[in-house]
Design a protein with these regions (language model features):
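Conserved SAM-binding loop of SAM-dependent methyltransferases across substrates and taxa
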Residues: 38-51
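A short acidic, Gly/Pro-enriched loop at the edge of an enzyme's catalytic core
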Residues: 86, 90-98
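Helix-to-beta-strand junctions that scaffold the AdoMet/dcAdoMet cofactor pocket
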Residues: 49, 118-120
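Conserved SAM-binding motif I beta-strand of class I
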Residues: 53-58
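SAM/dcSAM-binding transferase cores
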Residues: 139-196
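Conserved SAM-binding strand-loop segment of SAM-dependent methyltransferases
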Residues: 75-85
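Class I SAM-dependent transferase core
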Residues: 1-26, 32, 62-76
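Conserved beta-strand signature within the Rossmann-like core of class I S-adenosyl-L-methionine
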Residues: 121-131
Length: 196
């Protein structure tokens, strides 16, 4: 648990803003943060980029209820959705300029869940820890989901917080409905080279 003031600032607020190391959000119209939890990074990005239309999505109803305080504060262009990300794929296929997730799941699964929601020439930004092998494991899924890795930004938040990797993936081709696999299959057989 992160409870100390300095840790909350560094590991939640500052960490959320590191996404701007790889993308200029002033040029984006909309952003989806799935598995948002308490609103990181999406809530922080919305505060710093008030014109950006932000969708915060989480399957945990308690977490979404907590975030309704933002709506009570009359924050414009903010949407809260209480569902699983795979339930949004048909409705918002090829829709968002940017889709991001922080501390959600492994890279192959994360990629297959996120990429269908990204529009052509949009970006999937995966905020990952220091495990470079996990990022490597995700590259096959990125290709299969019509993406190309444009950048991997490796940095340290602090000595105590450890290394981070921000993976910037550009979407090159639309996702078709026929490419969407059920969640159970995504989990059971992730898109990895050994699972062809």
């Amino acid at each position: 648990r992160i409870v100390e003031k300095e840790d909350v600032y560094l590991k939640h607020f500052y960490d959320s803003l590191t996404l701007t190391k790889v993308i200029d959000l002033k040029t984006c119209t909309n952003l989806l943060d799935f598995g948002t939890g308490a609103g990181f990074p999406g809530m922080v990005l919305k505060i710093f980029f008030p014109d950006l239309k932000v969708t915060l999505l989480d399957s945990n109803n308690k977490k979404i209820k907590f975030l309704t305080i933002l709506q009570e504060m009359n924050v414009d262009n903010l949407e809260l959705i209480n569902t699983r990300v795979e339930n949004l794929r048909n409705e918002r296929l090829n829709y968002y300029d940017v889709v991001t997730a922080r501390a959600v799941t492994n890279m192959p699964v994360l990629t297959e869940l996120a990429m269908p929601l990204v529009k052509i020439n949009g970006y999937f930004i995966a905020m990952k820890g220091s495990n470079e092998e996990e990022i490597e494991d995700g590259k096959f899924a990125i290709i299969k989901m019509h993406g190309i890795v444009e950048e991997i930004n490796k940095f340290s938040l602090s000595k105590e917080a450890g290394m981070r990797n921000i993976v910037k993936v550009k979407k090159e081709k639309e996702t078709l409905n026929t490419e969407l696999r059920p969640y159970e299959k995504i989990i059971k057989k992730p898109l990895q080279k050994f699972n062809k």
